[in-house]
């Protein structure tokens, strides 16, 4: 297969990003908004993702302010739905750039994260699996559209097409199917079989007493969330492209804070307002920009489609394998 040069790769990245965001905005009726690069500290707005990852923080001494770099914008977006008075069944999306300093680095994990962060205003009565599945299918169709257009533009990629439909499976059903496997092994097995899956229910304990994966307790409802995972034929592995979910309401927030021993968060501004029903009900998520490009362009390493910071061993390994990191 022909390998794109660095310049050709940069052009292809722009092509994919332009195509995806236009179709995402149209399909979900999203308005583009400007994402913050810094957030106020100690307000509960930033996300600790799996519950333990700490954001990069700083103090501007001369200005008397302190801030932190976003890790994701899940809670910020929900606040903005209200602040911007976004109508029902419309939403927002932003180009989110984040630093996750505690990330374990790999060929698909970087401390730099770029994604389309989106949030859609829904009714409380729409907080259900049917709503979740409808939105997942729309996003999956856009991923398939992008794959078709990329393969048309770069003809040597015209192989290993994603299936027409995405397969839904709950994390509990996945556990029952592969009881002696780890969650990551289960993901690999189910992705290799169906090529595109959405695993429902991430964060809460399963019947074996452990969660499929960790999720912070204060943005997704653990019963109504999940991940879009595809089979990456280039690397023969499962690849998560998007994490999304129906957001917590005033009841599920309290339940999940209690389950995760995070009741102290009820005193933070964001959590107080949510418990008092001051924010719109919503569904939202993030779609990895670099991951999508990495997948569609058949790359070996995420660093081929994004500029980040890498330790010496990863740089040496890439050079040895003739992988050109940006």
UniProtKB/Swiss-Prot annotation:
GO terms for cellular component: cytosol
GO biological process per UniProt: L-asparagine biosynthetic process
InterPro entries to which the protein is assigned, alphabetical: aa-tRNA-synth_II, aa-tRNA-synth_II/BPL/LPL, AsnA
Name of this chain's protein: Aspartate--ammonia ligase
HAMAP family: AsnA
Enzymatic reactions: L-aspartate + NH4(+) + ATP = L-asparagine + AMP + diphosphate + H(+)
Chief location: cytoplasm
Pathways involved: Amino-acid biosynthesis; L-asparagine biosynthesis; L-asparagine from L-aspartate (ammonia route): step 1/1
Gene that produces this protein: asnA
CDD domains hit by this protein: AsnA
Entry-linked Pfam families: AsnA (PF03590)
The protein's enzyme class: ligase
Subcellular location: Cytoplasm
Sorted UniProt keywords: Amino-acid biosynthesis, Asparagine biosynthesis, ATP-binding, Cytoplasm, Ligase, Nucleotide-binding
Gene Ontology terms, MF aspect: aspartate-ammonia ligase activity; ATP binding
Family statement: Belongs to the class-II aminoacyl-tRNA synthetase family. AsnA subfamily.
EC number: 6.3.1.1
Domain of life: Bacteria
SUPFAM superfamilies assigned: Class II aaRS and biotin synthetases
Metal-binding recorded as keyword: no
